Design a protein with these regions (language model features):
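RNA-contacting regions in translation and RNA-metabolism proteins
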Residues: 1-42, 54-78
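Glycine-centered tight-turn and secondary-structure capping sites
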Residues: 46-50
Length: 78
């Protein structure tokens, strides 16, 4: 559910919604949601001073219902 919600939010922000990928993996410290977008959309997802990324993390944390979830925006150029 978190993965689908994050995918929907990010697709609404970017210019290339077909290039958005969200993957989930479990770690001992909780779940990690990795967001991959087209390189031209990376700045749009991160936002000025990281505000958009912080807002996405806040929404996901609220939906997580107490579970430990981390959202990482991955730079696919590296």
């Amino acid at each position: 559910m978190l993965e689908a919600a994050l995918l929907h939010l990010v697709k609404g922000i970017v210019d290339e919604p077909d290039q958005v990928r969200v993957s989930s993996r479990s770690t001992p410290r909780g779940e990690v949601l990795e967001v991959r977008v087209h390189p031209a959309d990376l700045g749009r997802v991160i936002g000025r001073s990281g505000r958009t990324a912080k807002a996405l993390r806040t929404v996901v944390a609220a939906l997580a219902d107490g579970r430990q979830v981390r959202v990482d925006v991955v730079d696919v150029d590296r």
